């Protein structure tokens, strides 16, 4: 049974609490700088949310549009979690720790504010993601994006030792795996609507009625 059949979503419902609790007791600007990539990096939560929430419009069925809406919205919740982690790791910094842990360059521009950049300080850019308007191309990118996000969280877990940080990072990592599986289900849904002899004879997001508008005269089910 597919994910969206198992769970009923309510659109535009917002709880004034994090999806997963973040309660960090001690500041650590070095760790904050590492985790920053999941705010504004190429494989981070901001990139993921914008990717899915923009790709959804061209998806061929309401079910798949709904799935991308749900996952894109959840990625915004994950962005809140990561931002809370970074903020709590830096809110009680001592001035001498800034240079000691290499956080001084970020501090000059943003103090302890949250700015979308990666661990190297490169600002977020929309060029990190693509919206192709083709269900196969976009869902393939989505599956790869979730694996890259999972790998990034794996790398973070290799570098941090604070249990208060490890706990929410593990949660986020697990959600990336779930999202990967859901996008795989969406891919199979697209395939089920097409001629199994060749899925790629038309663009299922654009060629609504395969016929004169379809360059290869394929057949939708």
Residue ranges and their predicted role:
Residues 2-221:
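Non-heme di-metal
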């Amino acid at each position: 049974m597919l994910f969206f059949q198992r769970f009923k979503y309510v659109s535009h419902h917002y709880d004034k609490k994090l999806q997963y609790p973040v309660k960090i007791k001690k500041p650590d600007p070095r760790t904050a700088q590492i985790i920053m990539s999941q705010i504004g990096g190429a494989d981070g939560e901001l990139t993921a949310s914008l990717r899915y929430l923009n790709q959804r419009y061209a998806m061929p069925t309401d079910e798949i549009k709904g799935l991308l809406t749900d996952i894109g919205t959840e990625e915004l919740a994950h962005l809140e979690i990561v931002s809370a982690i970074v903020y709590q790791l830096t809110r009680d910094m001592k001035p001498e720790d800034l240079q000691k842990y290499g956080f001084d360059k970020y501090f000059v521009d943003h103090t302890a504010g949250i700015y979308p950049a990666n661990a190297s300080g490169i600002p977020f850019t929309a060029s990190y993601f693509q919206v192709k308007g083709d269900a196969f191309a976009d869902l393939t990118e989505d599956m790869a994006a979730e694996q890259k996000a999972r790998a990034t969280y794996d790398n973070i877990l290799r570098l941090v030792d604070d249990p208060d940080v490890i706990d929410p990072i593990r949660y986020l990592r697990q959600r990336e795996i779930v999202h990967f599986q859901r996008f795989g289900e969406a891919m199979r849904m697209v395939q089920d609507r097409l001629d199994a002899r060749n899925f790629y004879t038309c663009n299922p997001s654009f060629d609504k009625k395969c016929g004169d508008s379809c360059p290869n005269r394929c057949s939708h089910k």
